[in-house]
């Protein structure tokens, strides 16, 4: 867990799902939320995505098999992105320049040529913003998150190694003079570049509304410095530009307006409207 404080702005980063779950389950409620109605433990499954905080925690820790099956069906039909190529010098029977010593020895592959090969093993960091406001429907949250899943799948298919983070930004409701002051930005590593794409593991943090409405809100309920101004509504969501400013890597906005089928390469992803 890495904490950075800049005045009233606090940035907290967790290196893994395990580290984050350990923190929110072992840290007591803060003074502001100790006697408040908690989103993390509220009843009702549709808006929250799960029936309880315990169910949400288990799905985050152990995977979401039911959604995994549905996602795998969608991802099987996923078209590949255009591969990223690099130019490599090779020896061939044809080329643009002879290698005289090899030619004199009668070696067939005595010409210098260039060959395009798919670029492999480039590591990139993707930050998925899940800072949705309370009026965002469960269906919309799931649709937007599935778009992100498709993008990650395409990148991995193309040969990129992806560090994937889920991010929340929330601010104190502005005062009459427009001052928001208190802000919290949370980033959780849900997939490291050295891990293969595990659909079951990523299904919950990327797709289930409980990731925000129970799990991430639980962080707000326990983080010690959160003030009472967050109790009713958990603050208001930071925008994608805030996320891009606070965290290194490529930001996937909360709402991806671009047609996913038109995203053909990494530059298209970097160019998503923020």
PLM regions: where:
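Acidic, low-complexity intrinsically disordered regions
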Residues: 1-125, 130-146, 150-274
């Amino acid at each position: 867990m890495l904490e950075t404080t800049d005045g009233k702005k606090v940035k907290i980063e967790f290196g893994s799902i395990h580290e984050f779950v350990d923190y929110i389950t072992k840290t007591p409620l803060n003074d502001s939320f100790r006697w408040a109605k908690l989103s993390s433990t509220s009843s009702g499954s549709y808006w929250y995505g799960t029936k309880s905080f315990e169910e949400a925690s288990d799905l985050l820790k152990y995977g979401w098999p039911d959604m995994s099956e549905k996602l795998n069906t969608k991802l099987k039909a996923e078209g590949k992105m255009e591969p990223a190529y690099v130019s490599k010098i090779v020896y061939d029977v044809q080329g643009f320049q002879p290698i005289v010593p090899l030619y004199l020895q009668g070696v067939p592959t005595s010409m210098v040529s260039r060959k395009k090969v798919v670029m492999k093993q480039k590591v990139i960091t993707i930050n998925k913003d899940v800072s949705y406001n309370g009026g965002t429907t469960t269906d919309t949250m799931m649709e937007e998150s599935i778009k992100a899943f498709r993008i990650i799948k395409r990148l991995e298919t193309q040969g990129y190694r992806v560090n994937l983070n889920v991010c929340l930004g929330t601010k104190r409701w502005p005062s009459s003079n427009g001052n928001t002051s208190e802000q919290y930005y949370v980033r959780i590593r849900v997939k490291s570049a050295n891990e293969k794409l595990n659909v079951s593991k990523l299904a919950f943090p990327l797709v289930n509304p409980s990731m925000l409405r129970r799990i991430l809100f639980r962080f707000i309920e326990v983080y010690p410095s959160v003030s009472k101004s967050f109790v009713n509504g958990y603050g208001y969501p930071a925008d994608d530009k805030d996320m891009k400013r606070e965290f290194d890597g490529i930001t996937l906005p909360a709402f991806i307006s671009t047609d996913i089928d038109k995203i053909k390469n990494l530059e298209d992803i970097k160019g998503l409207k923020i």
